[in-house]
């Protein structure tokens, strides 16, 4: 008998032993048997003290059992108030007409006054708006347009950076004056804007800004 045959035989013997041992263990357990009980079924009543129970198989019916009521502890509520009877037939037709007219006249007068006041306010508001628009246009035409090239923390740094940008783009910023503007943060600190120009028209300022943006230089119209 070869070695392989011996190994196979030993393996079969081990597997058989494990299988029969497991079957013996399962058969040795006690068998559980369920027997029917002889207790009478519990049926909950559907009517308790002349009250029909909606859900018989719930615990609600247990709360419906009332106790003895003491008549001395019962509080009787008073009768409700009787409704008022208003007889409108005793009023004359003239009184009704007079009341209606006396009610409508103040409303008509107030509406007319309000309309006149509104018309006056509209005229005044239109005049104020036109004046503000014309003033803004005059200020813009006199001041011209500037181009923002950046922002820094100090005025000296702003002037130095502006000169550097002007030197970098001599053709675009030729004959342009570099200025600064002090601006306040919300937290109280300040920063400085680097501004170029003044350009007489918006289209001219936009053209300069487009050329700077094409050359990867930040630019904002002011």
UniProtKB/Swiss-Prot annotation:
One Gene Ontology molecular-function label: peptidoglycan binding
InterPro entries linked to this entry: SPOR-like_dom, SPOR-like_sf
Keywords, alphabetical: Membrane, Transmembrane, Transmembrane helix
Start and end residues of each SPOR domain: 139-222
Organism: Rickettsia prowazekii (strain Madrid E)
Gene Ontology CC: membrane
Keyword Repeat: no
Keyword Transmembrane in record: yes
Descriptive protein name: Uncharacterized protein RP066
Location relative to the cell: Membrane
Main location: membrane
Family matches, as SUPFAM superfamilies: Sporulation related repeat
Residues spanning the membrane: 7-26
Record membrane topology: Single-pass membrane protein
